[in-house]
Regions:
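A short alpha-helical cap/connector motif
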Residues: 1-141, 145-207
Length: 207
């Protein structure tokens, strides 16, 4: 899927990314085992492995300056974005959540390149304020409130703040039709990934 989405990616680049990801997945599992009694969120909140690889590969290949994700939980997706940007030698991760007890698996060193924005009421106004403060965004990831109205709001607001090369990613697009409807409104064809339990979506920049 990654190679077909990014035809300019060489076989050697993809193989290198796969090797990096395998090592990082093992490190993440070790951390989770060691911290199992201190993590705030259950395992099923975590990003699934194929989706995690997609996110890591997109970040490694596109080398974004700014990534924004919504929904953090224990910090699995945050971990992969931060590790990808460390390899890239550039980039900052901004995460949006409604709670501050998130990202527990991240080390102090990883938190240096990570900014957590806790939404205040009214949440839509607070979300727009975050977007305005960090745009343009090169990668946007939705993984927060999986209701049609909120997802559509996030997608549309994020699109307005994205750079010309921006990639939009979304977890749990099988919860409702918001992602498909959003892409249809733009007359664009999304890329879908069926993982173990759910479906993730990706919308690439228009060529």
């Amino acid at each position: 899927m990654v190679k077909s989405a990014f035809p300019a990616m060489s076989a050697a680049e993809l193989a290198g990314i796969e090797e990096e990801y395998t090592d990082l997945q093992a490190e993440l599992e070790r951390r989770c085992d060691a911290m199992s009694d201190r993590l705030e969120y259950p395992d099923w909140y975590a990003i699934e492995k194929e989706t995690a690889f997609l996110y890591y590969a997109v970040c490694r290949h596109t080398k974004p300056a700014t990534v924004l994700e919504t929904g953090v939980a224990n910090g699995h997706s945050s971990f992969f974005f931060l590790q990808a940007m460390k390899k890239n030698g550039k980039g900052s991760l901004h995460s949006v959540d409604i709670a501050d007890n998130v990202g527990k698996i991240l080390t102090d060193d990883e938190r240096h390149d990570w900014t957590l924005h806790v939404l205040e009421a009214p949440q839509r106004r607070s979300f727009r304020k975050v977007m305005d403060s960090i745009s343009p965004i090169d990668i946007f990831v939705h993984d927060s409130d999986h209701t049609y109205g909120w997802q559509m709001f996030e997608y549309k607001t994020a699109r307005q703040a994205m750079s010309q090369k921006g990639v939009l990613l979304s977890d749990d697009v099988d919860h409702n039709l918001s992602f498909v409807d959003f892409c249809t409104e733009l007359d664009r064809k999304p890329i879908l990934l069926l993982d173990t339990r759910k479906v993730s979506g990706m919308l690439l920049p228009k060529v």
